[in-house]
């Protein structure tokens, strides 16, 4: 029990660090035909931990940005998957809105236009 309390205090101190990027999401930007088509924003701690590996497995031209959210300009829709968990990830769609909606439904995510 004492170890659990020490761990919780340590985690609270880490989250309250002076680094403004500590809680920032990471992102994986995917481009086709000269423009951004999709971006995956890793919000949860576990999602951030594996974000770079996940991004490397994407097709097409992809770039991983630690501690930098997806671009907001040009977003047609988004899909939040596993909200409020360590695995929370948001897919932002810049083209092919119907495809985005279908992927979101299949993943059981929350779709927003």
Give short role names for the model-derived ranges.
Residues 1-12:
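Sec-dependent bacterial lipoprotein signal peptides
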Residues 14-16:
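Bacterial signal peptide processing site
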Residues 22-113:
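Extracellular/cell-surface secretome signature
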